Design a protein with these regions (language model features):
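Short, solvent-exposed amphipathic alpha-helical segments in soluble enzyme
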Residues: 42-44, 121-127, 148-153, 176
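Adenosine-phosphate binding glycine-rich loop
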Residues: 12-16, 131, 135-262, 284-285
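N-terminal charge/polar-biased segments
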Residues: 168-169, 250-299
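Glycine-rich phosphate/diphosphate-binding loop of Rossmann-like nucleotide-binding domains
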Residues: 3-108, 257, 288
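Rossmann-fold NAD(P) dinucleotide-binding segment
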Residues: 93-103, 111-133
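A glycine-rich phosphate-binding loop feature that marks nucleotide/adenosyl-phosphate handling sites
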Residues: 24-31, 58-65, 226-234, 261-272
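Generic recognition of stable, solvent-exposed alpha-helical segments in well-folded globular domains
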Residues: 4, 32, 36, 101, ...
Length: 299
């Protein structure tokens, strides 16, 4: 989940034109999904040259008790949440957090239906030229907002992705195709690379690398339609390319135990893949030509 979400964020930056380290993220929810996404985002920001402490300052989380801050009177800041507790006065409501923090991206992963209200979406649109809105909770009934709400309220400005499938939305003559952050984009490629080159430790760096590989597969045509993920119809190619990229990464970082290292990684991967589709064995049929519905026999 974290890798898919971060891939979507990285692809979104191709639309917003804002460097990753200059973004501010607010999470609706501070459970395992949000913590995982935030952790990978911090790693990605550190790779751009800023310190881990500065990266964490750009990640804000809101749980059922409000903004996660140090010494919160209502408590509940324990475990992994402590890492993302900010030096800030307590704030109870998500909308007030967004007004104070002015994030460039909001990410929902707590299954709180309707959490991204019209006021929140309007605020995001007012504060950003291209606000990032990721409503990742599923099923659809638990989504923080629908694609239609996001595009309509932000007047087509937002970069939207969801955890549940939503139909295309037309606003002001332009049709947007919401991207779905489906885990199926990531785990087949990771599993394939892990098995084929015998990766014995799947580190957080492996997940971040898979996110970067996936983000790089989103072409300009997809971005122009609002998509931050490649079409699911290309899942075989996506999985193959992620596996190849991760195999290169694994050998470079001494994570692979399959030797000798394959010279042609693509040929190596494809040699272990199977095409499960069946060719038809039915005889070909043709329409009978007009005018030949009767046969004459002359002696």
């Amino acid at each position: 989940t974290a890798a898919v979400a971060v891939a979507g964020i990285l692809a979104s930056l191709k639309i917003t034109k804002k460097p990753l380290k200059d973004n501010v993220f607010v999470f609706q929810g501070a459970g395992e999904a949000s913590i995982g996404i935030a952790t990978l985002l911090v790693m990605a920001m550190v790779e751009t040259g800023i310190s881990e402490a500065d990266a964490i300052k750009r990640v804000w989380m809101v749980d059922s008790r409000g903004l996660i801050v140090k010494n919160r009177p209502s408590g509940g800041v324990t475990g992994h949440k402590m890492r993302f507790a900010q030096d800030h006065a307590p704030v109870d409501k998500l909308v007030d957090v967004i007004k104070k923090v002015k994030p460039t991206a909001i990410i929902g992963a707590a299954a709180v239906a309707g959490a991204f209200t019209e006021e929140i979406l309007t605020t995001m649109a007012n504060n950003n030229e291209r606000p990032i809105v990721f409503a990742l909770s599923n099923p659809t009934s638990k989504a923080e907002c629908t694609a239609e709400q996001a595009y309509n309220v932000t007047k087509g400005k937002c970069v939207f992705a969801s955890g549940s499938p939503f139909p295309a939305v037309t606003y002001n003559g332009k049709t947007f195709h919401p991207g779905q952050g489906n885990n199926a984009y990531i785990f087949p490629g990771i599993a394939l690379a892990t098995i084929l080159c015998d990766i014995r430790s799947i580190t957080e760096e492996v997940f971040l690398e898979s996110a970067k590989l996936l983000a790089n597969m989103v072409d300009d045509k997809s971005l122009s339609m609002g998509l931050v993920y490649p079409p699911l119809s290309r899942i075989l190619q996506v999985s193959t390319d992620i596996a190849i990229g991760l195999i290169n990464f694994a050998y470079k970082h001494k994570l692979a135990y399959h030797y000798p290292e394959p010279e042609d990684k693509r040929k190596f991967v494809e040699s272990y893949q199977y095409d499960m589709s069946y060719k038809t064995f039915e005889p070909a049929t043709y329409d009978w030509p007009d005018g030949l519905n009767s046969t004459e026999c002359k002696v």
